[in-house]
Amino acid sequence: MAASHPYFNLPDFTQPSPPSTPASLPSKHHHRCGPSNATKGLFVALLGGGLSAGFVGPFSRMAYQTSQLPSLELLIFRCLFHLPIALLLKFRGDPLLGPPDVRVRAFLHAILNVLSIGCAYSAVQVVPAGNAVTVRKGSSTVCSALLALCLESQGLSGYAWCGLFGSTLGLIIIVGPGLGTLQEGTTGLYTALGYVLAFLGGLALSLGLQIYRSLHFPSCLPTVAFLFGLVGLMVSVPGLFVLQTPVLPQDTLSWSCVVAVGLLALVSFVCVSYAVTKAHPALVCAVLHSEVVVALMLQYYVLYETVAPSDIMGAGVVLGSIAIITAQNLSCDKEGQTEE
């Protein structure tokens, strides 16, 4: 009975006590640091979107120079590479046209992308490939930043604005001297039309990216990729026979360019669509300016077209701006829980 008295309920000092762990020192073995979503999106846009798309413009110009391949016919060949995605959607049991509640927006996204690509392919046939890509990417970056501010109230940091300003300045340095040809009669008129088409292509691209960010349903990416091919064929096939003359490529070089354009454009489409869901659309478009640098290199080494010193200086400014944007967004997310 005496042992049950509270004064006798003392700890047994004869037994060793368990080792104590400081409560203030968390364990370092239960969390990892991985790249953030914005970092992943920007790297995908840089490596998969910008670099692959940089080959599309010069290859399109090569196909036009060797076989006089019309822009709408090139768009048809590109859309054909998107149609096999229907097999993936059927295999997964998803509707080909997307859920009924978002079907209109998905079709609008496809129409804007087809318009953007059609304008881009038409522009590279009348102006140098590097300049056409420059104007298109510059307008898409500026329009994406303005649309994000107006529609989403999504601001940017000071470093991001610095990178956007630098990349746009680099594009102006590249394309500015070429605007002097606008005063050379009929040639200048076609040149002006090419720059206008490139600008409209960038505007349509920025609108399409904003619409894609509002689509949230399973298999969104393969659905919009398939719709791009479907809508592109519906628009370009009648337009080819009404506005242009169909040409069947006869040489191996033309067919190689057509296949390369289709595959590289599909890779770029998928990567850009993924990246814009992870990072700010204006930053994604700014990183895609790497396409301009690749196009200028191919313009000089493959197409043997003149690259002015202003092109080289502008390309350097663009690369520096991309480095600023990428470095500012290099952050990591901690994975896992920290134990106390």
From Swiss-Prot:
Region (Disordered): 11-33
Keyword Transmembrane annotated: yes
GO cellular component: membrane
Residues passing through the membrane, by range: 39-59, 69-89, 107-127, 160-180, 189-209, 223-243, 257-277, 283-303, 307-327
Main localization (coarse): membrane
Domain EamA: 51-176, 274-327
Entry's localization field: Membrane
Keywords: Membrane, Repeat, Transmembrane, Transmembrane helix
Matching Pfam families: EamA
Bilayer disposition of the protein: Multi-pass membrane protein
Stated family: Belongs to the SLC35G solute transporter family.
Protein name: Solute carrier family 35 member G3
Organism, as annotated: Mus musculus (Mouse)
